[in-house]
Amino acid sequence: ALILSGGVAVENPKPLKKNLRKIKKISRQLDKRVHARNKQERLEGKKKSNNYRKLSVRLSNAQRKVANIRRDFTQKVTTILTTHYAHIALEDLNVKGMVRNHRLAQSVSDVAFGELCRQIEYKSMLNGIKVLKADRFYPSSKTCSVCGHIKQDLRLSDRTYHCAKCGAIIDRDYNASLNLL
């Protein structure tokens, strides 16, 4: 989720998660249809069946729909951010490392964080907006935005930040956004 300075959270539509069942179903159906499965069969002239062609069009349409939803969301959000805000702060996340983790890979790819950052940087350059990149090792989520106390034992599953020093209770992502600005 993107957290704006007013505390508003912009949720990603997660198009792949919503359409994954449909894509998998079409892929399974496609594998059952007659087509050349290797180079030898292609050389022998084994052709694709009409149903194979129809299903491959359905599969590409479903995949195109996911890509279009993702692109539309990214374009609209980056346009709003770069036209309404004077400063934008981004965390320099290790997206490649996050994609290597098999538990995070699909959801990180579905968000398209790299493309979002690239478009924010591009559009902010056009509009003359300053983009701040925070170091990936800066403890923005672990630092209290009220008193500055750093909480060492904050897990990813903890969605609210509870400060032991001043007693502040705040949403984890909103706390990080306040610390980045």
Short names for language-model regions:
Residues A1-L181:
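Positively charged, helix-rich recognition surfaces that bind polyanionic ligands
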